[in-house]
Amino acid sequence: MADKFNILLLNGPNLNMLGVREPEKYGTLTLAQIAARLDRRAQALGVSLHHIQSNAEHELIAQIHAAFGNTDFILVNPAAFTHTSVALRDALLAVQIPFIEIHLSNVHAREPFRHHSYLSDIAVGVICGLGAEGYEYALQAAVNRLNKS
């Protein structure tokens, strides 16, 4: 059976260090463990999920551009690029693919410089502070939205 929808998951800088990086803020699961959980959930939902993690802004932008015309939804944890990247914002605006912004920690309960996002106002929604489960909620929300369209 062909997958009904194609979803792209982008993970930004330092998320490759999950599991060892500040576990009190980000939890003990590795990105690979989170991805495996999401793959199982995507399979159960009948959608195709493609994962990319990069510490390089230009690589994430290239993936967003490549998604044009073949991706139905984007899930993105921009990590530190949330607060700095007009370029990611512009790439997402250019392709006009709906997306949900995800953060493991509650960015609003952290340092003031983390309170501003260049993506939130153009996102379908934002999930933050719910740990690794936030990815699963975002995936379900994306599928729900796509099924309504």
Curated annotation (Swiss-Prot):
Keywords: Amino-acid biosynthesis, Aromatic amino acid biosynthesis, Lyase. The record marks 21 as: Transition state stabilizer. Substrate binds at residues 77, 83, 90, 104-105, 114. The active site is at 26 (proton acceptor), 103 (proton donor). InterPro entries: DHquinase_II, DHquinase_II_CS, DHquinase_II_sf. PROSITE patterns: DEHYDROQUINASE_II (PS01029). Its EC number is 4.2.1.10. GO terms for molecular function: 3-dehydroquinate dehydratase activity. It catalyses: 3-dehydroquinate = 3-dehydroshikimate + H2O. GO terms for biological process: amino acid biosynthetic process; aromatic amino acid family biosynthetic process; chorismate biosynthetic process; quinate catabolic process. Pathway: Metabolic intermediate biosynthesis; chorismate biosynthesis; chorismate from D-erythrose 4-phosphate and phosphoenolpyruvate: step 3/7. It holds the Pfam family DHquinase_II. The keyword Amino-acid biosynthesis applies. It comes from the Bacteria. Belongs to the type-II 3-dehydroquinase family. Catalyzes a trans-dehydration via an enolate intermediate. This is 3-dehydroquinate dehydratase. The gene is aroQ.
